[in-house]
Every structure is written in structure tokens, then in C-alpha cells.
Amino acid sequence: MKRTLVRPFITSAAMLLLAACSATGGPSAGEGVMVRQITQSAYCGLTGPGVAFVRSEADREALLDVCGQNMATDVVRKVDLSREALVMVTLGQKPTAGYSVGLQSALAQGESLVLDMRVNEPAPDMMVAQVITSPCAVLAVEPRGWQQIRVQGLTEQPLVRTLEN
């Protein structure tokens, strides 16, 4: 009795594995890229939705010295800029507490880094502090000579930042 159940199970598992291995991405498919979220904050001090790409110590310090910022700057300063670049994704000013932004996924499409971000906002009936916030997430990315960063999920249209060499 056991043998009659094991054989169909193994056959089904093998078919499923073969089907998964033969699947390919569509025309917009990209390859995976090493991106890690190192911190996020409700108070980044930046007023509009946007994306900043940081490759130098001077650029990093300028971003961390923004007035009104309250984030874990020590973890940002620990990133070795010779091995990784930093990307700061900002949601812009919000009228209350309860908003946040975080990395959902990342992929490379040619020379473009595509970041899919998740935005959380307070429920309509939630009690929140009436305070201006400026949520952001700071990401560490592998440097691949990116020509463009495309951020999806913050605004109706993707934010696109063209990078200089």
C-alpha cells in the first residue's frame, strides 16, 4: 500500500520541479541584484518623494547632515562605500505619523536598478499624532556601474534617477 502512494507522489514532485525549472520570465524580467535595507526612519528631513545615490563619503555625510533627520546614522556610516553604494528612497512629507517605506524587491534590467518599494500608511480610522513626518529607507546596493535607478511604488509613476559616471 505504501509503494502505491509513494510512486505517484515522486512522479508529481518531479513534474512540478521540471515545470518550475523550465519557466522563464517575460519581456520585462530582470536578474536578481544584491540589495539590503540597512535602516528606515519616519524623520529623514527630506520634503519630496525622491531617490539619492551615494558613492562617496562626502555625499554620505551631506545626506546624513540634513536638518530634521532622526535615523540610525551609525549603521549608514558602517557601510563600506568601496564595496557597496547607498540609495536613499524618500516618501516626502506626510501630515501624520504612521507612514513608512521599505524595500519589497530589487532587480537589474540592463544598466538600470529597479527598486520596488512598499509604502505603509495609517488606516483611515487609526489615531495618529498630527506631526509632519518624512519617511525614508536607506539601502546598500552592489555597485555595477548603474546608469539609472527606477523606484516603483512611491508615486503613481516610477521615479527615475539618471546617474552620472
Q: Residue ranges of each PLM-predicted region?
A:
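Exposed, flexible binding/inhibitory loops of compact, secreted disulfide-stabilized domains
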Residues: 21-165
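Sec-dependent bacterial lipoprotein signal peptides
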Residues: 1-19
